[in-house]
Amino acid sequence: MMKYDVVVIGGGPAGLAAALAARETGVKKILIIERDRELGGILNQCIHAGFGLHEFKEELTGPEYAQRFIMQTAQTDIQVMLNTMVLDISPERLITAAGTDGLKTIQAGAGLLAMGC
């Protein structure tokens, strides 16, 4: 069984930002679980500008904004599972997930739901 201090379910902008914030506060073992084949969530479809003014002090398209968070995440030791669907979360924070390589059981110290829309 895999064990993580924090497991973030959802690899869109909220999930990426939450994982990065947890890392900045000193959390060591962080996992992001994303059902899609890439991170970024709905932002990858938002081709209009207007993102990033608060966080990055410049106007970005949705994909550009997502890519900033993806790059920041890649520069850390945050683990990512793509193509993985969460099937169950128990009261004891045991997460059952199905990926391309079968079922996984993950023990989370804390879980954060950031599945978006």
How should each PLM-predicted stretch be described?
Residues 1-9, 66-117:
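FAD-binding core/adjacent interface of flavoenzyme oxidoreductases
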Residues 4-68:
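Beta1-alpha1 glycine-rich phosphate/pyrophosphate-binding loop at the start
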